């Protein structure tokens, strides 16, 4: 389970950078757990009002799926929708009160000419009939899923007060083929697994993708220099830069919030230690110097601290050090194995891969209340590589099921889990990207 031997065992690989080549097969989502206490909301079908060709995307279906998988909402099944208003003025609120719905979303899709569509939608509080949102968005047919994700974000934020994270992307690595003929790919997709793009193909494993804060670049580990090397690649253009190929291990890159630095693990002086590299000058600052293995750095939201995994105390635990250097302090104390930290946007929550015996699960350390509370989020036996959504409402992680790799997204309260599966490959090494800008 531990990632330390993985770095030491990697062989020389060959990478073939691609410019965001679309891959046909995406991820499919199965919801394997639900939250009966979630807020009930009716997202009504949004019909197309024009004689021209309708967009292929079911906008209301995407919105409903987003809200469902958040764990905060429970949408009314289509079979129970007895009335189908498309404007707020057509809503008969007693109908939805009888169906025990707290909120209702209505809307319609219009032809905006020149190959674009306009989606108009409204959100209402069923209890008092008050309109909470009334918005419209225009986009081309190819961008209608983006529109739906942004609609779900707006609805989520209006009701919960927390920014939605549906209009985001995830990165992950796929592995296919048989021993001796394995093929790997670094992928980027929408947060629900749709619209996959191949960023890099490889004949050897790819590791540790990490997003820049603007979502335009990925850092990752490759092996084309006779050992591990770290590259940074532009997602849109496919251009990439070799930033670290020192003798020994070059591992676990992590972008600073300012986008101008990365933290990484290097063994150039012996044991793997944590360093910070300025991406312009390539100057290095060594932050740790211990007899153990220090790896998997991740930044605090303000860039002042770096959390990392170290076995300096005998077993892997999470430690913290100032990003300009200084003494490291231990952060995790529950359990004998805590690794692969991901830190929430407010630095109050940390998710880790937590081991007990031969069982490894995703656990969250929550200090929001001022005291430390632990909660186990996953149910597998070989769960790893947790990654917070940018609003910390969900966690993406890798698991093994039936001898193959899959991804799971779990709500932060552990009440809702979805499995993301590739039909023809293993999936591993997930990383949830930052918020995307809305144009």
Curated annotation (Swiss-Prot):
Transmembrane segments: none
GO biological process, alphabetically ordered: cell division; protein import
Gene3D superfamilies on file: TolB, C-terminal domain (2.120.10.30), TolB, N-terminal domain (3.40.50.10070)
GO (cellular component) term, any one: periplasmic space
Domain of life of the source: Bacteria
Keyword Cell division applies: yes
Keyword presence, Cell division: yes
Signal peptide: 1-22
Location within or outside the cell: Periplasm
Main function: Part of the Tol-Pal system, which plays a role in outer membrane invagination during cell division and is important for maintaining outer membrane integrity.
Subunit and interaction comment: The Tol-Pal system is composed of five core proteins: the inner membrane proteins TolA, TolQ and TolR, the periplasmic protein TolB and the outer membrane protein Pal. They form a network linking the inner and outer membranes and the peptidoglycan layer.
Family of this protein: Belongs to the TolB family.
UniProt-recorded name of the protein: Tol-Pal system protein TolB
Species of origin: Xylella fastidiosa (strain Temecula1 / ATCC 700964)
Gene name as annotated: tolB
């Amino acid at each position: 389970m531990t990632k330390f031997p993985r770095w030491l065992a990697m062989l020389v690989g060959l990478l073939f950078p691609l410019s965001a080549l679309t891959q046909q097969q995406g991820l499919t989502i199965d919801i394997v757990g639900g939250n009966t206490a979630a807020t009930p909301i009716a997202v009504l079908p949004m019909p197309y009002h024009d004689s021209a060709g309708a967009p292929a995307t079911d906008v209301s279906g995407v919105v409903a799926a987003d809200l469902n998988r958040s764990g905060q909402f429970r949408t009314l099944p289509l079979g129970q929708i007895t009335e189908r208003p498309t404007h707020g003025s057509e809503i008969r609120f007693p109908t939805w009160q009888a169906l025990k719905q707290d909120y209702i979303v209505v809307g319609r899709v219009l032809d905006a000419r020149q190959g674009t569509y306009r989606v108009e939608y409204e959100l209402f509080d069923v209890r008092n009939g008050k309109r909470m949102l009334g918005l419209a968005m225009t986009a081309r047919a190819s961008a209608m899923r983006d529109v739906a994700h942004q609609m779900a974000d707006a609805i989520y934020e209006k009701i919960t007060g927390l920014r939605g994270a549906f209009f985001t992307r995830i990165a992950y690595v796929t592995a296919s083929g048989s021993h001796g003929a394995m093929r790997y790919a670094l992928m980027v997709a929408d947060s629900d697994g749709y619209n996959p793009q191949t960023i890099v193909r490889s004949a050897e494993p790819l590791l540790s993708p990490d997003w820049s804060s603007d979502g335009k670049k990925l850092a990752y580990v490759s092996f084309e220099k006779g050992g591990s090397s770290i590259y940074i690649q532009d997602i849109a253009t496919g251009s990439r830069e070799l930033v670290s190929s020192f003798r020994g291990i070059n591992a676990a890159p992590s972008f600073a919030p300012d986008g101008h630095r990365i933290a990484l693990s290097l063994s150039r002086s012996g044991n793997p230690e944590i360093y910070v590299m300025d991406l312009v000058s390539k100057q290095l600052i060594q932050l740790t110097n211990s007899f153990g293995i220090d790896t998997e750095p991740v930044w605090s939201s303000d860039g002042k601290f770096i959390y990392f995994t170290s076995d300096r105390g005998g077993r892997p635990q999470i430690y913290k050090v100032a990003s300009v250097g200084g003494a490291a302090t231990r952060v995790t104390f529950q359990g004998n194995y805590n690794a692969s930290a991901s830190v929430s946007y407010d630095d109050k929550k940390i998710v880790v891969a937590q081991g007990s015996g031969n069982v490894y699960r995703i656990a969250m350390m929550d200090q929001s209340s001022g005291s430390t509370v632990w909660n186990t989020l996953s149910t597998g036996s070989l769960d790893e590589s947790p990654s917070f959504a940018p609003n910390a409402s969900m966690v993406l992680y890798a698991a093994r099921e039936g001898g193959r790799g899959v991804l799971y997204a779990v709500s932060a309260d552990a009440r809702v889990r979805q499995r993301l599966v590739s039909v023809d490959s293993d999936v591993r090494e997930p990383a949830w990207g930052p918020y995307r800008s809305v144009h």
